């Protein structure tokens, strides 16, 4: 058993960052990435937020596939919900921009693909001063990349000129 910090939903790079931020031994993400929800998979990060070796990933997959990983209730770790992850990850993202950078005066269409960025993405861009038109920000667990995101770039192609935005992301 291991102790777990539950921090989602957060985009995959956010989990990599928070793994390092919290000095965790490793991070785990359940993600459909740029696919539809049926293609959800598991991604693992090492304590530095980097990708695990292929060998270690295969070993974990074998253990999960065998169904042999069992523990008594006394051996289980604890799970704790952490609530500051979005604020911290948003702060980190903003800090990667040049000091004093602002998006003020820009009209931006932001397509979050009904995925894990649906909260942190709009807040980040709005806090940086953008006039924001968010789309794909209503996830229900089954609509990731459904008529939005990477599977439907036409949503941005139509929305950006339709609202006279400066750009679409």
Q: What is each PLM-predicted segment?
A:
Residues 1-48, 161-168:
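Ferredoxin-reductase
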Residues 40-163:
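Gly/Ser/Thr-enriched, mixed-charge loops and adjacent short helices
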């Amino acid at each position: 058993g291991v102790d777990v910090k539950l921090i989602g939903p957060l985009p995959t790079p956010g989990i990599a960052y928070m793994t390092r931020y919290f000095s965790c031994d490793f991070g785990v993400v359940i993600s459909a990435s740029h696919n539809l929800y049926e293609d959800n998979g598991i991604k693992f990060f090492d304590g530095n937020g980097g990708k695990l070796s292929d060998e270690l990933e295969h070993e974990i997959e074998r253990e999960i596939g065998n169904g042999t990983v069992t523990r008594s209730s006394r051996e289980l770790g604890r799970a704790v919900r952490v609530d500051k992850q979005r604020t911290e990850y948003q702060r980190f993202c903003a800090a990667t921009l040049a000091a004093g950078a602002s998006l003020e005066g820009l009209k931006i269409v932001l397509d979050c693909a009904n995925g894990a960025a649906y909260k942190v993405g709009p807040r980040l861009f709005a806090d940086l001063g953008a006039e924001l038109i968010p789309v794909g920000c209503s996830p229900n667990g089954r609509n990731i990349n459904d008529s939005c995101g990477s599977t439907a770039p036409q949503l941005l192609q139509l929305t950006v000129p339709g609202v006279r935005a400066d750009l679409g992301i």
